Amino acid sequence: MSPEALHPTRRSFLRAGTAAALTLAAAGCGFASGDDPADAEAARTPIDVKVDGDLVYFNWADFVDPTVFEGFQKEYGVKVIQSNYDSMEGMAAKLNAGNRYDIIFPTAKWAQRLAAGGRLRGIDHSRLRGAEAVFGGYGYFADPWYDPRSEHTVPFTMYKTGIGWRRDRLGDLTGSWDDLWNAKAKGKVFVLDDRDEVLGMGALKLGLPLTTGDGGDLARVGETLHSLRPHLRGFSSDSYNNLLNGNADMTQAWSGDMAAMLAQAEDPAVFGFEVAREGAPVNSDCYAIPANAPHPGTAMLFIDYMLRPENVKKNIEYIGYPMPVRGTEDTYAALVEPFPQCLVTADDLKADLFFRNGDTRGEQARDAAWTDVKAG
């Protein structure tokens, strides 16, 4: 592989965060309630879709095609002022510190926390020209578990979790989470540095609920994961580079990162991506507008601009993640032709394997289990 082709992906920097950030009750949702009455009133007021200032943008690094930014700035005569986070906990910390952004991109469970904490503006889909291509084409997002009727969000990307591996070193796998225990890969296996993903993998392997917070279940999950430790090279969310540079023979991986890797691989046939028959977690990122956004009208224009099919196609090819906008499916299918299991299907959504927020006791139990797994 060409070393100069390597670069970090959107997920490369994701980390599990501290236990304190993850044990917050569903009611508080990890966010300090907005104390400014003006912000609370604004959150209830419909957004007037018009330019009302530059766009203050807060997202993962390198997760929108730069030419899309350029086109938006030229069309609307505004600047995109970018800031980046490297975890959802980092995003939450900035919001709790009072920083003001026009557009953010939380994952599903964090969108639920934000909305429950009164931290998001409502989004009137009727004011978005591109909304029908999303909500009319993807019924799941018309009323997702994390945001009833998508009142505060518009879906940005979706993806699932599986196993990436090097065929040139391991040959074919069996289509099971058991493959992470493959003796041929011992010492060259990574799992994601992500609490929910790793505990979830162990739970699915055992036939347990994906986000179980039951102490007995988690004890079994912990025992299973401890048996994996001799096979591990480490915990890392940089699946893309670990496979490309030969640091890993096998890794737990997000489908979007595997799709992005294909664009850099000299020979895609060297690699494989599988979804385990025991189940594949599905997740999504969302567009959301904070309650204290200084320029919500510009944010609405940006969401609508991003929903244009030509911009969706550019971004799919740039980041490797599918975007649920009708008419763009062929773009992603062509991108992942060597890895068809990267596609997120209707059956994947129906399987209901989502990382949901638990109650305080369950989240604390999961934190403790994760700490134990990481400690070895």
List the model feature ranges, each with a label:
Residues 290-350:
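Mature extracytoplasmic/periplasmic domains
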Residues 179-194, 206:
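Short loop->beta-strand "edge-of-pocket" segments that line small-molecule binding or catalytic clefts
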Residues 121-132, 268-281, 290-293:
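Short beta-strand->loop
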